[in-house]
Structure formats: C-alpha cells, structure tokens
C-alpha cells in the first residue's frame, strides 16, 4: 500500500524468501542493493521504511540491529555475530532467493550440477565424488551416502525409487522445513542426480501435511521444473528420464523412520519393517529404494559444483561438511544455524546463540529436542 501511495510499485520489488535463520530478530527485511537489514519489522513500520529509506535514502535507525555486547550498529545481516562461525551449504539459498521462482534458482547455479552429471559423469563418477566428499546421512544415523547409493545401484531391478524423507517429526525441529520452504529446487535437483546415479526414474517427497508452506512451494517447484524440462523425459537431451511426486504424511512420529515411511507411501499403516532386507535392496513396492533426508540431499548439488575436496575441507576427520541445527529454548538468538562439523556445543550456545538471557549461567543443553 505504501509503495502504491508513493508510486513506487514499478521501481521496488517485494520478494518473499525462506528463513534467514536469525528467528529471534524476525520479521527481517533486507533492502537491496545496499543490503541493509531491518529487524523486528511490523506493518506499522512500512510507512517509515518507504518514506525515509526508499525515498530519502536515510536509514531507519530504530530498526537497525545493535550488538548486545559492543552496542555497535550492524547494517548487514551476515555481519552479525550470529553468522560469524556459520558456514551455509545446505542453507545457502534460504533467505537469498524467491523460492517460488525457478529463474532465481537458476541465477545461483541452479540445475547446473544436474546438467553436469547427466552429460559428463558416469554413475560411478558420482559415487566416487560422494565418497571423496565424506557426506554422511544427516537424519541421525550418519550412514555414508555413497555407500547407500552404491547398494541401490548394484541391485538389479526393472524399477527403482528415490525418496526424500521430509517427515520431520521431532518437536522443535524445523531444519528440513526451512530448506523446503526456502530452496525447494535444490532438493528436486539432488533427487534427479540420485535417480541418475542408481538408475531410478521415479521419486517421491514424503512431507507432513502440517507444513502447508513447504507443500505449496514444492508443488510450485515441481511444476516449474517439469515446464522447463528438468523433470520428465530426456532431461538435458541426455536420454535420462526422472519425475517426482509428493506424498503427504499425517504427522505420525514413527513415519520419520524410513521403512515406516515406505509403508505409509504404499497406503498401509506406518509401521517399521524388519531389516534386512534393507530398502536399497527391497524398498518401496518391493523395489530397490534410497531414502535420504532433506539436509543430506541439499548438500549434493554443491558437492558436484564445487568439488568433493571443498566439502571435505569443513568438519572433522571422520565427519565432513556442515550440520544444521534448530536452536531453541532459553537462549538469546533462537533460530536456524549451520556450522562445520566439530563445532562445540558451547560455541553454538554462547558464540552463535548469544548465551543465556539476562546474563544467567548456562547449565544444560539437550540435543535432539524432547525426544532426545
């Protein structure tokens, strides 16, 4: 309304993005090209932002971020202490692009990894890259991703499946939801790469129905990818075909377990299956299936584009890369953080999280939320 009143609708574009991560200071507005960010913005502030910043080029000081320790004014979001020790790989596009426009994903190398894989790499080449990167499953078990994919590739079958486990059942967890809401095309691209690698032409994203924004943006992203020829027949003229469908879960906690998830997709009660056989050998509808969670998949396009050595340069000797955490509870900076593996819990709580409110002593932290 304020833009219309000041005849700025053709000059200023408002873009809805995914989560920036610093939830404690939200809602956050970033104004480009200066990249000035305002925090805790309310509808009543719109008039001031338009009149002062957009028209007169003057910063709205009361909406600027003040460092709690130094009292310094910080204009750039990534200059705040919250981001100093973070390394955004899985979250790289969250808050940076409009997730409902595939063109903005293209602008940040979107689908280049898929194009490279289907036109230049063999299936074994992709597995070798994943092995060198050291990527392990981010869903909890930490199983090497290349090994899971290798088992499925080696399984002989007329049909194979790729599944994204987006059934984030732990109370207080919103890591996967934020990626789906902020960067859905990254998951689609990664699943297509997985399909090429194991020889699958069909994938399913299993997401709980309680995530309406994520579901809507995934539907939009899948439709856009099909329209651009990035899902469907003969992708990039390579002869490789792959398509995706959504399956909505009813919110059962047990369906976060991969075999219970398979049962749910098949239309049965979500109950875990005895193993072996493992899904990579006998999974969805009795066919070889790989199940990866959202965060695991979000890393894959970057590993292809920047190289496995780049990814392996973060983290520890046995745990490469980064890990996303939902930071909540009695802490200054609640939100979403992505840090290199090996970062200590104290660094997360005190350096990134800003410590305990009112200067109180840090006594305990529980990882994994109420479910442990």
Regions picked out by a protein language model, each given a short descriptive name:
Residues 85-86, 215-341, 352-353:
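Hydrophobic alpha-helical positions that pack around
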Residues 1-5, 24-56, 144-155:
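Iron-sulfur (Fe-S) cluster-binding segments and ferredoxin-like electron-carrier domains
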Residues 1-3, 190-194, 342-358:
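Short amphipathic, charge-patterned alpha-helical segments
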Residues 130-152, 251-263, 267-269:
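Conserved phosphate/anionic-ligand binding catalytic regions in large, soluble enzymes, centered on
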Residues 2-20, 53-56, 125-135, 354-364:
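Immediate flanking context of iron-sulfur cluster ligation sites
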Residues 183-197:
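Histidine-anchored nucleotide/phosphate-binding helix
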Residues 12-33, 134-144, 253, 363-371:
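Local cysteine-cluster metal-coordination motifs and their immediate loop/turn environment
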Residues 35-132, 231, 264, 270-285:
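Fe-S ferredoxin-like electron-transfer domains
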